[in-house]
Amino acid sequence: NKNIDSVHATDKDRDDDDDDDDVEAINRWYRFDSDDEIVDDGRLPSSSVSWKSGFVIDESSKPFFISSKTANETLKCGAAIAFLKNACKDEKWGDVSRTILKHFDEFFASLSKSTASTAFTSDDENNFEKLVKMLPDIISNAKRVADSAVRESLFEHYRLKAHFVALKQYLLLGQGDFIHALMESIHDELDKEIDPMSREGISQYSLRGNLDAAVRVSNACLADQHVIDALSVRLMKPLEDETGWDVFSLEYKLRAPLTTIFSDREMGRYSRAFTFLWKLKRAEYTLCELWKAMKPTVSSRFQREGLGGNIGKALEVEQARCHRVRQSMHALISDVQYYVMFEVLEPSWNEFECKLSHNAANDDLDSIIAGHENYLNSVIEKALLGTKSQVLQRSLQLIFDSVQKFKSHTFKLYEAIEDASRVRKSDQRRILEREMNQQWGVDFGESKEGEDYLSEDFVTGAKESLDSIENEFQKHVDGFLKLLPLQTHVDTSFLSFRLEATFRQGA
């Protein structure tokens, strides 16, 4: 290319040769038949591998009379064709180039009755001025043609919209039946502790089988096969005393050209959101499982089977307290979950989807990438996962820990009651059999009041343990409620109102 220096080319010292040089510069700077020529012209580096950083303007080769805006549109037009050819492997890139060049030729031909190359070297200054004036519109039209081809390739051939939806459904837990089925099938495996050195204790092969089972029994089985193939499981590096719950994550694997939009950075943010939502879902699932163990029919059965007396009355009190604590925990988890799912995820998605639909005809790849980044920014910030909400996030984690401690306490309590009930029932059968055989009297440990089946020390220990968990949970809730109004960068007013109404009554 002939480089044009704006310092030496002023309106006063221009001559006919300069005009010829200028139009020839336009000819060479804009006319290209492939991305290889773009690279040779110096506008794109030959080592470009990234859409954002791989395409740059070589100012030394840009004609001085080309504005920055027009030059940038030229760059994006060429970059779009290069992306179509190299990343999308779309054979239509040649047709797009020829269509653009045809528009150029038609315009240049309209300037002169001669051929396009003659128009470029014409001595008619009016033609040159007209060319410079109308060039931005020509380039804009060329860019629209290239952008349209890129959009068509991404959305129709590579099913970009389907992948946006899949990430919302699976990594952002929008597909409720699938997530519940996955939780049902996977929780036993994730309860296992992991050796930090060998990573033994949990099988990724088993987790993959659980994932496939959850897909089969849910509506996820109706998804396109390319979506199912992209869904996988990942185990992060475990730390000391961690279980499968701490290292498990769903993963969505994509390849070029989709990785231009779903970069490592963006997929990391999806993973971050999944980790939080998975913990929230686990807490909800845990509390629902506890309700099954604690429901009134279980308590009444214990009474029918003879765990009466002072021990029985003390257990009744503890069972009632367990119900109250579980109800408080469930109220908080449900409110937070409602906020995240219906006040954060759904509105953010609806806004993003609306922009995809309404601006589809005008969006270039940069607009799609920016729209997706804004969508994830909204999710991360409003879901209280941003850098400004780190203290609040730690407070929520302490609440999640309290839920798991309560689960451990409650299951131990009810297992002990179940064991005592079984022993009591077995003793009652033996007593009945001896009475039928006219063998009167009872052995030690067969008291009909049940005091010998569960000791007072056990009941006292259970009470103290529940006291500690309840106080700890309330402390964390108080801290969370104090921190929530400080999140001025997001609107948490409705969440604060609901939680205040639940936990500040009678305070």
Locations of regions flagged by a protein language model:
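Extended, charged interaction scaffolds in large complex subunits
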Residues: N1-A507
